[in-house]
Design a protein with these regions (language model features):
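Active-site beta-loop-alpha junctions enriched in small/polar residues
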Residues: 21-23, 53-55, 81-85, 123-126, ...
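Conserved short secondary-structure transition element at the edge of the structured enzyme core
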Residues: 143, 235-293
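Glycine-rich, positively charged active-site loop/lid region within alpha/beta enzyme cores that binds
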Residues: 90-93, 193-249, 269-273, 316-328
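Glycine/proline-rich, positively charged
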Residues: 89-183, 187, 198
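Conserved, mostly hydrophobic/aromatic
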Residues: 6, 18, 35, 50, ...
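N-terminal binding-site loop/beta-alpha segment at the start of enzyme catalytic domains
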Residues: 1-77, 327
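Short, well-ordered coil/turn segments that N-cap beta-strands
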Residues: 11-16, 46-48, 72-76, 115-119, ...
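A short acidic, helix-capping loop that chelates divalent metal ions and anchors anionic groups
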Residues: 22-27, 85-92, 284
Length: 328
């Protein structure tokens, strides 16, 4: 497994990470046993950058990850997030970036993960009611006392990133980036590169759409949250599916999978970008790991660009309510 440094932070992570969200929620049924086996296999393969959050499964995902790494903590870089608040029944209750909440959330995450220190601690969504300087100030105190090693932001605007960086070094920005979500190329990527901040790309497989695994909406279970996403809607599904055909063709010519092409494309966008595809199954993890062996020629990249120009996907990447919480 290759390594990459997150910006100029000094934090070295595997070039490919593992998003753990779907092991607890959102993407249909999951098995804890299989999920833990997937995490263990990831570590064995050198995929040691693990990503979770306190809101995934209302804390259950952190507990799952903590259990999986209990006897191999020194082999992983552990990232979690705070700030997206949920009630005891899983209801979404907005965001909270107040200093008191920051510190309380960290304590709860440390307990659930059963660790003494979190390697990378992100603010999951920016709280528009609290100046980012106050939130990051509280986060920096967690670094001072040794509960957190590095700080990160998620789905923050360029202006917010700049303000945050003046308070404490930001190691990473985590934001969606893939062939069908390229908004960050306008302002976000140039900003983090200017400031020496690493970029962690979540949903690099377009929430699974770019894998070529879906042919109709019926392929999504009734409990799958993607049914509520505009790009998976009846209105947009067919046109988005047509975009994936070029990826299929390139993959077939190289004797690899569409997933591997999609991940290789993200990896090719810069050594400072680390994609964290999520999966709860060993076979998909292994498939994703092999994307690092895929080399895209200039011709391949040109074909991909022609098929997936900026803004090619139909529909917004989140439902309206969730879109309101990004890039602020």
């Amino acid at each position: 497994m290759q390594d990459r440094e997150l910006g100029n932070s000094g934090l070295i992570v595997s070039a490919l990470g593992l998003g753990c969200m779907g092991m607890s929620e959102f993407y249909g049924e999951a098995s804890d046993t299989e999920s833990i086996a997937t995490i263990h296999r990831a570590i064995d393969l050198g995929v040691t950058f693990l990503d979770t959050a306190d809101m995934y499964g209302v804390g259950a995902n952190e507990e799952l990850v903590g259990s999986a790494i209990a006897d191999r903590r020194d082999r992983v870089v552990l990232a979690t997030k705070f700030g997206s608040v949920r009630g005891p029944q899983g209801e979404f209750m907005g965001v909270d970036g107040t200093p008191a909440y920051v510190k309380a959330a960290c304590e709860r995450s440390l307990v659930r993960l059963d660790v003494e220190t979190i390697d990378l601690y992100y603010q999951h969504r920016v709280d528009p009611k609290v100046p980012i300087e106050e939130t990051v100030g509280a986060m920096s105190e967690l670094v001072t006392v040794g509960k957190v090693r590095y700080l990160g932001l998620s789905e923050a605007s360029a202006a917010t990133i700049r303000k945050a960086s003046e308070i404490h070094p930001i190691a990473a920005l985590q934001t969606e980036y893939s062939l069908w979500t390229r908004d960050v190329e306008d302002e976000i990527l140039p900003t983090v590169r200017e400031l020496g901040i690493g970029f962690v790309a979540y949903s690099p497989l377009g929430r699974g759409f770019l894998t070529g695994a879906f042919s109709t909406r019926a392929d999504l279970s009734e409990t799958d949250a993607r049914r509520n996403h505009p790009r998976f809607s009846d209105e947009h599904f067919a046109s988005n599916l047509a975009l994936v055909e070029t990826v299929r063709e390139i993959a077939k010519a190289k004797n690899v999978t569409p997933s591997q092409i999609a991940l290789a494309w993200v990896l090719s966008r810069g050594e400072d970008i680390v994609p964290i595809p999520g999966t709860k199954r060993v076979r998909y993890l292994e498939e994703n790991a092999h994307s690092l062996e895929v080399s895209l020629s200039e011709d391949d990249l040109a074909k991909i660009e022609a098929a997936f120009p900026y803004g090619a996907a139909a529909g917004t990447r989140y439902p309206e309510a969730s879109m309101a919480a990004v890039n602020r």
